[in-house]
Amino acid sequence: MALRRPMVAGNWKMNGSAQLAQELFKKFATKLQDDSAEVVLCPPSIYLESVRQLLDENKEALNGCLVRMGAQNLSQHDFGAYTGEISGQMLKDSGCRYVIIGHSERRRMYGETSVIVAEKFAAAQKHGLTPILCVGESGPAREARRTFEVIAEELDVVIEKNGTMAFDNAIIAYEPLWAVGTGKSATPEQAQEVHAFIRKRLSEVSPFIGENIRILYGGSVTPSNAADLFAQPDVDGGLIGGVSLNATEFLSLCTIAMSA
C-alpha cells in the first residue's frame, strides 16, 4: 500500500489581505507539529509575494514543516495579449509550487470547459507547477445517478490531452458542486465512494498512478467533520475554502490531517 502524505490546501478565493496573511502566520506558523502532512496556501495572486515573504521570514519557526504556496488559476497561454491573465512561468517566478485547475467556480462562472481545463493542466506542468485538478458533479447529476459518468468525462479529457502519466505529478480534488460553499458536506461514505472510483479509474491505465496519486476532498470541510473524512482510505486530505481564512480552524484541519 502506498504511503501518501496527506495534504491540506487552503483556497482563499477572492478574500484576504496582506494583513490577514500576517495574522494567519502569527497564529499557526509556530504551532504546526511536523512534516507528516503538507500544507498549501493559495491566496489571491496579488498576495503571492506577501505570502512568499512570510514563508521565508518564518522558515525557522516552521521548523521543517511542509508549507508551500499555490495559485488559484493560470492561463493556458504562455504569453501574449491576454489582459488580466497570469502565465505558469509568472506563477513559478512568484514561488508557487501548486496551482488549482478547473475549480467549479471557474467552470461555472467563467465558462471554463473541460478542454480549457486540460490545456491549463498542460500549461501548469510545462512550467514546473503541480496542478490540483478539481472534478465533481452537480446536485442534479448526483440525483440522476450520473456522478461517476460526469467525473469520468472530466478526467478523460485531461488524459486525452496529457496522457495518464501526467498524473504522476498532479493532485486531484473531488469537489461535489452541491457541497461547495453550501455548508452541506458529502458524508464520509459518499466521499470515499467517489475517491475510490477515481483511484480505480486511473489504476486501470496505470496501477502506479492509481495507487500513489493524492485525492483531496473539497466541499464544506470543517474541524467537526474532517477527522471522519480524512480517515477514509482513499481521502488524502482536503481542498479548503472559507475555513482556510480562520487561522484557528485551519490549524485544526492541518493537525487532523497530520494524525490521519
Curated annotation (Swiss-Prot):
Active site (record annotation): 103 (electrophile), 175 (proton acceptor)
Pfam families in alphabetical order: TIM
CDD domains for this protein: TIM
InterPro entries assigned: Aldolase_TIM, TIM_sf, TrioseP_Isoase_bac/euk, Triosephosphate_isomerase, Triosephosphate_isomerase_AS
Family matches, as PROSITE patterns: TIM_1 (PS00171), TIM_2 (PS51440)
Annotated keywords: Cytoplasm, Gluconeogenesis, Glycolysis, Isomerase
Biochemical pathway: Carbohydrate biosynthesis; gluconeogenesis; Carbohydrate degradation; glycolysis; D-glyceraldehyde 3-phosphate from glycerone phosphate: step 1/1
GO cellular component terms listed in the entry, alphabetical order: cytosol
Reactions accelerated catalytically: D-glyceraldehyde 3-phosphate = dihydroxyacetone phosphate
Annotated binding of substrate, by residue: 11-13, 181, 220, 241-242
Compartments reported by the entry: Cytoplasm
GO biological processes: gluconeogenesis; glyceraldehyde-3-phosphate biosynthetic process; glycerol catabolic process; glycolytic process
EC numbers: 5.3.1.1
One annotated GO molecular function: triose-phosphate isomerase activity
Superkingdom: Bacteria
Disulphide linkage map: none
Main location: cytoplasm
Family (UniProt): Belongs to the triosephosphate isomerase family.
Functional note: Involved in the gluconeogenesis. Catalyzes stereospecifically the conversion of dihydroxyacetone phosphate (DHAP) to D-glyceraldehyde-3-phosphate (G3P).
Subunit note: Homodimer.
The protein, known as: Triosephosphate isomerase
Organism this protein belongs to: Shewanella halifaxensis (strain HAW-EB4)
